[in-house]
Amino acid sequence: MKKILLVLFLALGIISFSAPNFINISKIEKNGYEIGGDKENRLLIVKTLEKENTMENIYISYDFIEENPNVPNRKHQFFKETSPEGLEFTNSFETKRAIIGKYTEINNTYVYTFVSKKNKVKNCYVSVCYATDKNFQKNELEKVCNKFLDEGESYLK
């Protein structure tokens, strides 16, 4: 699982750090996230939660690109096309708020992607990659998706 998460992490981008002024970096760090990568057009924050014998990883990506209705679909497609070997795309569906993707690894690790379809801040698209051992059903995923997108958007000023 660590290799898969590392590849996802690298695929989302890593460089030096300088966040836009509409992102609250102190709040991000206060909530246990680390800056995982920063490019001119993307900021990635990362958090690992260890509970008993399990580990969960949360990656929140902020893409700074001109608004375009095709961006969420392209980001979802990017996740599908760049998923690491050993991580199988299971299915996806859309809600009013997001495109949700589900991936499964052989050892019962599940990776969920949540790509927001609407921007809270102009030209800033939020997406989340969540790795866990929990196999959520479709009816549960919308609630999980909203929780993580709400969290990601809470760091926007």
Language-model regions: role of each:
Residues 81-119:
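Signature of long, low-cysteine stretches enriched in small and polar/charged residues
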Residues 4-16:
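Sec-dependent N-terminal signal peptides
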Residues 17-46, 145-153:
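N-terminal "mature-domain start" segment
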Residues 46-76, 124-128:
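A short acidic-to-branched-hydrophobic micro-motif
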Residues 40-44, 54-59, 106-114, 125:
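Short, surface-exposed coil-to-beta transition loops
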Residues 42-51, 99-103:
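Generic recognition of long tandem-repeat/solenoid scaffolds
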Residues 74-85, 141-145:
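Long, charged/polar, surface-exposed segments that mediate recognition or autoinhibition
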